[in-house]
Amino acid sequence: MKPSEIARVLTENLKLEKYKPCGVCFSDNKPENALEIKKKGNGCVVPMILKASTGVAFVVSEESTGWPCSAFYLGFQDHIFDGIEYFLSNKDDFFRPCEKFIQNPELAKSLINNINPVKPDKKYIVIKPLEDFNESEKPESVLFFVNADQLSALSFLMHYDAPEKFDRIIAPFASSCMATITYPLKMAMNN
């Protein structure tokens, strides 16, 4: 199915009104008028991913990854920062307030050590509306934003042909860029 057809089917059937389904791909070319974070180490990529779903392409390169976490999760560097396991867990004497998302540093370290993000094989990761993909482009993964009712409908639909299956939907711990880019790319590359 062509990307534009995927976009049409998702938009019509899920009644997506506010945000457009987007595709994620790798490219050596930056789309015209694409948004890009100005420099490495400054800013979160997630608001830009949301902006892409309103119709404006967004690119990430090694020079424009935003925060160190994004650089790691998007495959542009092999290390986040020293002490990430404390930042994600419960160590109170870290240099900044901890997020306390994970019970302890050991569990957080285990998570980080097992992420293994997909390494981009081209200069850019491109996130743009599926309807803007040309005939020669193929999305590696698809992302779209939904409300709670739409998410519920998707959950039911995933079990339409096999209601006894319990492994069709996963919700692993993840930052927003991991959930929208890292994990879907890994799943796509493994299929």
Which residues fall in each region the model found?
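Acidic, serine/proline-rich low-complexity intrinsically disordered regions
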Residues: 3-191
